[in-house]
């Protein structure tokens, strides 16, 4: 089912009725560049010196929407590995991929599924020349038997994805 593929396999970006899925796809297509060689810029009239009062909050959704143009954020694979947030924003008109760990969901730790989700997303951004912003607030790795089986390889894949990416990368440490 689409719910299983979304929550357990990470193969589906959006789940819902036809109207909501089409709405999300339109948002995604509008924020992505037409191809990997096009510049991903739009005009922006947001105040570049705007304040972000809740920036110290442990809620990456709030931080991401606060810093993005027009507070717009298109999250992808929301239901898969929910402790890791991936999606797209515009910063001063430029499309930027965002990776953030949702510290409130997993106690400030990384999971193997979250690392895999982030690695796949970084590779996608690199393929389309989209810069990556990482918002980090993490203490370590989730200590469960199931996670311990996969975390070393997953963390290595994530590290390699960042190291191999040729796009600009910025890390914002919030905790």
Where are these regions (language model features)?
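Ligand-binding clefts of soluble mixed alpha/beta catalytic domains
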Residues: 1-175
